[in-house]
């Protein structure tokens, strides 16, 4: 539902809202927030709420440390796990300089700019969806997370083997209460590993929902005395956890250009899709692809076109949940723009099983970077990345 500032102010008054959480993100995609009293909301809409940017990772600049948070009324959601008396609401914020100009390191602003660019220059809109995998681990006697899985179930098992069923149920209910539509959930292949999927949307909404989703999962796991682990490879000899990104276009005739554009820039983008050392423990093992190619329904290809009765979609299978979805989507949109403007053509699809080591080694496909250092070096030397993100 879309709210105006006037409607939010009226809602706060009528529903006895006491606290307003102003949410924003650092460059790693970690959600931050400042809480203000309801009486301060008109000022926040009008003048913004200042904060010390020098204390935020990636924002550090003591000479220009004063930035302002401006809540976006359209992103209003109620926190359903807080008391109903004295409600708490949250809004995502745009970050601005004191003169009112957008802050250049605001990752939501970068994504908004990319969305406008592909609309204005290519005449289309991209929709995004995400598929999150995560592990549920037990806590030790001190309340600290262990690497002991909550259960030993496997892919799509039922209770009692699947002990995560009720937690996934609570996650889905909470998603609905916060305006996010869940579509499916199940136990994944690893012990204690789960997946919950929610409906696709425009790029900014999906990035906002992805960040909210991780917060909800961690909160609901903690309420059950568990730890939700989104790391790419928490247990070395077990399946890793990815964040597959699904992309569809408002103009199917551009799908080949979009696919080709993403493949042509995937090496440079990998640093932002897989930004931790642990990310590279997952890639290339147990259904986590690393070969730069595409296939129809082929899960061993880094980019695949799933079977579908509706609009075609692309599924990028290499990303993981440690990425900043705003930066990831921004770069993917720019790669799509490049593919469209240059009229890039996709290489032939592969039907090879690249999870088979012998088949993979005999293929001629390039791979994405093998390590974080390689990925970082590739990004730092990329004119494509510099042209979009500057010196972030």
Q: Where in the sequence are the language-model features?
A:
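Glycine-rich, acidic/polar active-site loops that bind/position phosphate-bearing ligands
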Residues: 1-392
